[in-house]
């Protein structure tokens, strides 16, 4: 910068003057002027932030109002890994949810003496097996949630709602309600920088399963799992730690198992068996996949393949209860009912508290014509352990074989089970007319 000429005459500017005029005026702002700092200082994406003088990056603050230190601009700034605020108010639309049908529920369960109030905490309802009440409470809390931007709460409540509907065998209803999420592959659910997904992984898996099971769109379900598997592979490549890689590998293998599950549900047992045989696993995971293959080949009726897979699982890590049960089931599938009953009786003596073994023993006795013994075992199971679906179904079948007044006995059984305070043992409290064969 030069001094403009005055009166038509100029003078020579010395080097010292030029040096002084080239320097900008130093800032004299104090702590109270810190708010005048350009906004780019707090912008983690601003390229000029690291080059700012340290005096401006860390302005002095009044001692009476200490503030936490700002994260360094050359590292991950606060908020980059967190999901930006999204308005999920569309999940709170009461029209997206339905009144649960009660036509398939025995009357004793609708007017149970020990049913907890709907105002009970959802976790308590889930632990006690009251899935119908938990589903109702979840959607009430979801619709009345104060903040449509509370992603974690809203998505958790929706997950509880859909999972409870599945546990109540209302898959079609759950599939219909899951459509409130829209397209989970849209950019709306993605972090703009990290590409992280807003929706928790278990809920995404459930939505894919509902697309297949709720509407019978099996191919769509398989394609959905393959899409999630592609994301797993990409995340394994981008993972920064071994723990993160292990997590995504586990999810990838789980997607493969779920594909086999869809193949089983659509009746393609041979395809499911071949698919399971292609899954890569290590250690105990190899045993887990081999046991799944064993069950699939049992459904197919290929006993030699079932024995081969069971032998591979036993060589990996033997388990007397599981391996013995599968060996007995192979005998049962081969129509060797007496041998299967002997296998299960030995297991029942070693594991008297295992309800699965006791029920299978009762079924084998039923096939060998010992209906009274089978009825005794199943009746004792109902009294001593939390009743599960197949147990009630088998006992109702025995009632049909033993008496013409079986409907009265089934209804009495329903009243007895409805008088329980909770499900317990990881099973639901409510049972449907299907289990009682009403």
Question: Which residue stretches match the model-derived regions?
Answer:
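Intrinsically disordered, low-complexity acidic/proline-rich regions
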Residues: 1-114
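Internal amphipathic alpha-helical repeat/solenoid segments
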Residues: 88-157, 175-192
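Solenoid-like repeat scaffolds
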Residues: 105-110, 141-149, 181-186, 229-231, ...
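"A position-specific structural signal for the A-helix of alpha-solenoid helical repeats
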Residues: 120-124, 160-162, 167, 199-210, ...
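Structural motif corresponding to the intra-repeat A-B loop/turn of tetratricopeptide repeats
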Residues: 128, 168, 214-215, 266, ...
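TPR-repeat structural position
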Residues: 131-132, 171, 217-218, 269, ...
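Structured C-terminal portions of repeat-based eukaryotic scaffold domains
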Residues: 307-438
């Amino acid at each position: 910068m030069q001094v403009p000429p005055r009166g038509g005459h100029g003078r020579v500017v010395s080097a010292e003057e030029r040096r002084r005029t080239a320097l900008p005026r130093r800032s004299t702002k104090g702590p109270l002027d810190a708010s005048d700092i350009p906004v780019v200082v707090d912008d983690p994406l601003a390229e000029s932030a690291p080059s700012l003088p340290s005096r401006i990056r860390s302005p002095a603050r009044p001692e009476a109002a200490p503030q936490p230190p700002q994260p360094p601009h050359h590292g991950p700034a606060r908020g980059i890994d967190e999901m930006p605020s999204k308005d999920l108010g569309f999940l709170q639309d009461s029209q997206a949810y339905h009144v649960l049908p009660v036509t398939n529920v025995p009357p004793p369960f609708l007017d149970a003496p020990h049913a907890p109030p709907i105002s009970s905490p959802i976790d308590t309802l889930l632990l006690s097996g009251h899935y119908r009440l938990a589903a109702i409470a979840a959607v009430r809390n979801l619709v009345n949630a104060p903040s449509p931007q509370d992603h974690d709460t809203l998505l958790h409540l929706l997950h509880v709602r859909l999972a409870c509907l599945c546990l109540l065998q209302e898959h079609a209803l759950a599939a219909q309600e899951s459509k409130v999420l829209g397209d989970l592959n849209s950019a709306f659910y993605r972090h703009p920088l990290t590409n992280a997904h807003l929706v928790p992984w278990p809920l995404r898996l459930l939505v894919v399963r509902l697309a297949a099971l709720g509407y019978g769109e099996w191919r769509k379900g398989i394609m959905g799992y393959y899409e999630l598997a592609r994301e797993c592979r990409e995340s394994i490549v981008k993972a920064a730690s071994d723990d993160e890689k292990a997590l995504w590998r586990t999810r990838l293998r789980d997607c493969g198992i779920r594909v086999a599950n869809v193949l089983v549900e659509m009746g393609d047992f041979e395809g499911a068996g071949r698919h399971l045989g292609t899954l890569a696993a290590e250690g105990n995971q190899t045993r887990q996949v081999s046991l799944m293959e064993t069950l699939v080949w049992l459904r197919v009726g290929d006993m030699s393949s079932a024995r081969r897979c069971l032998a591979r699982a036993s060589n990996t890590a033997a388990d007397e209860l599981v391996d013995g049960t599968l060996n007995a089931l192979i005998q049962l599938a081969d129509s060797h009912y007496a041998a299967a009953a002997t296998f299960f009786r030995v297991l029942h003596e070693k594991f008297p508290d295992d309800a699965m073994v006791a029920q299978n023993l009762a079924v084998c006795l039923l096939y060998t014509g010992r209906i009274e013994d089978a009825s005794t075992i199943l009746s004792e199971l109902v009294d001593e352990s939390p009743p599960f679906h197949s147990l009630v179904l088998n006992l109702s079948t025995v009632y049909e074989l033993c008496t013409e007044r079986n409907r009265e006995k089934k209804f009495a059984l329903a009243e007895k089970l409805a008088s329980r305070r909770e499900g317990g043992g990881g099973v639901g409290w409510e049972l449907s007319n299907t289990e009682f064969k009403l």
